[in-house]
Amino acid sequence: HGDIEVFDYLLSRHDELKWDFVQIQLNYVDWRHAKEVNTRNTDAEYLYAELVKRNIPAVIMEPLLGGRLSRLNDHLMARLKQRRPQESVASWAFRFAGTFPDVLTVLSGMTYMEHLQDNLRTFSPLVPCTEEEFTLLEDTAQRMLQYPTVPCNDCKYCMPCPYGLDIPAILLHYNRCINEGNVPQNSQDENYREARRAFLIG
């Protein structure tokens, strides 16, 4: 939520200001691909390394990239489930963020009791990611970014729309269709009526 110049400037004054911790956005996509998600972002690998250099603990926000890492497409989800069938897809992102030794805490936006229970299972105790798992998650990030989805996390900052459109719902439906490979090319396509009905009715 800030630019890199401000980050670097504030860290350059650590000897004087003595930061107790710094909050950064860190997840397995933003680790090396932050600019592909948002051109204003900086890779978490750089942000974290700068904190480590100064022995400043990191507080992690957006470990699930606004929930997107808990809603992977079926193909990517299956790859993670094959490795750890009993664990949620979200737990992979939390384990990634929690593996780094200078992480003080990982923030989690929880809506339901099931989210809290999943987080407790993931962190009590935390099983750090192996090098092989880091490689798998990097590959997952690269594959995820190849899908032509819209980077919407349903924050609703774009609402209300002056034309009465539910912008997040439209974008999320589009993303779901892309992820499922269910995008009709035109109104003559075999599955057009079915896809249209799914969008309008659910």
Where are these regions (language model features)?
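Beta/alpha (TIM)-barrel catalytic core signal, keyed to glycine-rich beta->alpha loops juxtaposed to Asp/Glu
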Residues: 1-165, 169-172, 179-195
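Short, intrinsically disordered, charge-balanced linker/junction segments flanking boundaries
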Residues: 197-201
